[in-house]
């Protein structure tokens, strides 16, 4: 397999995801690493790679809101809250939603909620559409190192054989803003 995922990049990335492996890809601000949210094996590989404890919880990134619905509980949202969220999506704003009991703990960590985002990065939209579901998404960097902004930086941190979807980031300087879906409270400035 070509580990740089050249040629039919989306199909090659999906093959890697279906093998319960982790891929790197450009997002709005930095490269992300991601995997199948329904595979505990894949998520544990991602957490080990990042040296991140499972109790911190993760973010899902999706092509559209429908892809996120199996993982979140939006029944408590008012029409005004929905309008606020949908006015920011697609885009670089992550919202923390209540999570139903069916959402795996390997995604939510110690929380009863899950952070989710509908991306506006064309390559990630195409990847999630082709895969048919969201991806776990976290910044592509090893513990203690800055997030990768280029393919070369990904290769330097993760190795030349690490599967990377080639492309450019969206040019944003900061990672996504994170807000509570119910209260609007700002958790991280974007």
Curated annotation (Swiss-Prot):
Q: Name one GO cellular component term.
A: cytoplasm
- What InterPro entries does the entry give? DHBP_synth_RibB-like_a/b_dom, Sua5-like_dom, TC-AMP_synthase, TC-AMP_synthase_SUA5
Set out the biological process GO terms recorded for this chain's protein: regulation of translational fidelity; tRNA threonylcarbamoyladenosine modification
The protein here is known as Threonylcarbamoyl-AMP synthase
Gene3D superfamilies, A to Z: DHBP synthase
What EC numbers are recorded for this enzyme? Answer: 2.7.7.87
Q: Which reaction does it catalyse?
A: L-threonine + hydrogencarbonate + ATP = L-threonylcarbamoyladenylate + diphosphate + H2O
**UniProt keywords, alphabetically:** ATP-binding, Cytoplasm, Nucleotide-binding, Nucleotidyltransferase, Transferase, tRNA processing
* The species this protein was found in: Shigella boydii serotype 4 (strain Sb227)
Q: What are the residue boundaries of the YrdC-like domain, all occurrences included?
A: 7-190
Q: What function does this protein fulfil?
A: Required for the formation of a threonylcarbamoyl group on adenosine at position 37 (t(6)A37) in tRNAs that read codons beginning with adenine. Catalyzes the conversion of L-threonine, HCO(3)(-)/CO(2) and ATP to give threonylcarbamoyl-AMP (TC-AMP) as the acyladenylate intermediate, with the release of diphosphate.
Which family, according to the similarity comment? Answer: Belongs to the SUA5 family. TsaC subfamily.
Q: NCBIfam families per the record?
A: PRK10634.1
């Amino acid at each position: 397999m070509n580990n740089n995922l050249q040629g039919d990049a989306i199909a090659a990335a999906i093959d890697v995801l279906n093998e319960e492996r982790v891929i790197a890809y450009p997002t709005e601000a930095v490269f992300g690493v991601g995997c199948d949210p329904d595979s505990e094996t894949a998520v544990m590989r991602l957490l080990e790679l990042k040296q991140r404890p499972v109790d911190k919880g993760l973010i899902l990134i999706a092509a559209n809101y429908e892809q996120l619905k199996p993982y979140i509980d939006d029944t408590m949202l008012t029409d005004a809250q929905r309008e606020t969220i949908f006015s920011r999506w697609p885009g670089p704003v992550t919202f923390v939603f209540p999570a139903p009991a069916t959402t795996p703990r390997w995604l939510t960590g110690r929380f009863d909620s899950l952070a989710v985002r509908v991306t506006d990065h064309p390559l990630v939209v195409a990847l999630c559409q082709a895969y048919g579901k969201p991806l776990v998404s976290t910044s592509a960097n090893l513990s203690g190192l800055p997030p990768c902004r280029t393919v070369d930086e990904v290769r330097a941190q993760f190795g030349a054989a690490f599967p990377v979807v080639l492309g450019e980031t969206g040019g944003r300087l900061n990672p996504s803003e994170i807000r509570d879906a119910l209260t609007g409270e700002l958790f991280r400035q974007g």
